[in-house]
Regions:
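Charge-dense, helix-prone N-terminal extensions
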Residues: 1-132
Length: 132
């Protein structure tokens, strides 16, 4: 993956996603979840390279940053939760896709949503007796 178009296309391949340019600056393009408006992939050009910002679990964040020189603390974002991937050809496509996938999963997974879905599955029987 070496172009913004490839990164955006991969991000847009996930369900319920859309592309946006929030700063009225075509250099900053992002992919967000339509329903929640949460962003999981930022793209921009800096120093002659396309950069991607992705959300990362702290354990994986440290792994990715130590494994690749071109994965750094998130530019213009919370350094603890976001990483920047510089598309200079040194990070393999599968690693980039894994990081984008992790970012998507982090913004779509919510404990509240999991609890709500679990509660909806609890059977509602006709023989339920009220407790007095």
């Amino acid at each position: 993956m070496t172009t913004r178009e490839e990164a955006l296309a991969f991000g847009l391949s996930y369900p319920d996603t859309c592309q946006d340019a929030p700063f009225h600056d075509t250099n900053w393009q992002l992919v967000r979840i339509k329903s929640s408006k949460k962003v999981f992939l930022w793209t921009y050009e800096k120093d002659g390279y396309i950069n991607l910002n992705v959300k990362a679990d702290p354990e994986w964040r440290d792994y990715w940053r130590s494994a690749f020189v071109s994965v750094t603390a998130g530019y213009h974002l919370n350094k603890e939760h976001w990483s920047t991937i510089i598309l200079d050809g040194t990070v393999p496509d599968d690693a980039i896709k894994n990081m984008i996938d992790e970012s998507y999963r982090m913004v779509t997974d919510s404990p509240t949503k999991r609890i709500y879905e679990a509660v909806k599955k609890i059977p509602k029987g006709k023989d339920r007796k009220s407790v007095v």
